[in-house]
Structure formats: structure tokens, C-alpha cells
Amino acid sequence: MYFRLLIFYIFMFMACTPNDTSNSSAVPLRSEIDDKYKWDLTKVYPSDEAWEEDLKKVKELSPKFADYKGKLLSSSANLLEAIELSEEINQLFGRLFHYSANSLNTDLKNEKYQAMYQRVRNAAIKSGEYSSYYAPEMLEKDYSVVESFMDSEPKLAVYEKSFKDLYLDKPHTLSENEERILTMTGKMSG
């Protein structure tokens, strides 16, 4: 039985091995592909330099989120400012990741884009450390506080579902220190 299986696999291997080993059927290099078939990442960033500027910007903005620690729910204005800052940071990270990941996906051997992807990943981990207090601090107060803030500041009403989801997850939310440690484990995972 073993011998028959071995013969079967040998014949299958031979049948699947191409006869023509020339490069004529090889996957073309990216430089050989017509531009109309390539991602146009210039719509995300016109250049790597523009990407660098936004990475610098997100690294400057991220620590500012920590300024709201301990006073996040002291007023509706503070909560709104913190959320708007968080949104700005998250939008920047979205673009930064999209550009670096898709640039890397065009050539996984490209060390420049490997480094860019790793740099934005590290910046996101660091940003997560600055914001690790957010959920635990929000959940220290009753949801009625957030509801009153939404009543007094109409711009907060668009975040109602996010607030409700956060409070629904309260039983599964870690302390600030545990959240920070969990965020920091991203440094070890890749």
C-alpha cells in the first residue's frame, strides 16, 4: 500500500511539474506591469515624504490624548475634544497603515516599506499606551453622566452607539494598568 501511494505521489508530482522551465511563464516584475493594473497609492499620499509628515504629526498628536486623563468626564467639552482628537489620530493611522501596508504588498521584499509598516505599527502601539485610560475612566461614571453630556452638547450625540457599546462591554473591560500592559504586548508580537 505504501509503495503504491509513493508511486502515485511521484506521478502526481511529475504531472504538476511544468515542462517549460524558462521564465516565459513566470510572474512578471512589478516594473513590467502596465500602470493601469497597479494600485494608485498617490490618492492616499502623493509621496513617501507626505507619509512621513503624517507619521510625524500622529506622533505629536498621540501624547496630547493623555492630557485628558483624569478629566475626561469633567465636562462635555472635554469629552468632545478628546473624542475629536482620537478621531483625528485614528484617521491618520488609517491612511498611514493603508499606504505602508499596500506599498509593502506590492513587493514583500522591499525593506523600505517593511520599515515604514513597522514604524507606523510601533507608533500605533505607543498611541494605544496614551489612550489606555479611556475606557476604564469612562466606565467609572454611570452612563447617565454621558447621557447628560449628550443632552448639553449635541455634537456628542453622534457617538451614542459607541458610548452604549462601551458600557455594554463594561464587565469585560480591564483596569487602566491592565489595558496599558495589553497594549504594550503588541511590541512583543511582531
In which residue ranges do the predicted regions lie?
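Hydrophobic h-region of N-terminal signal peptides that target proteins for export
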Residues: 9-17
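Sec-dependent signal peptide recognition
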Residues: 1-9
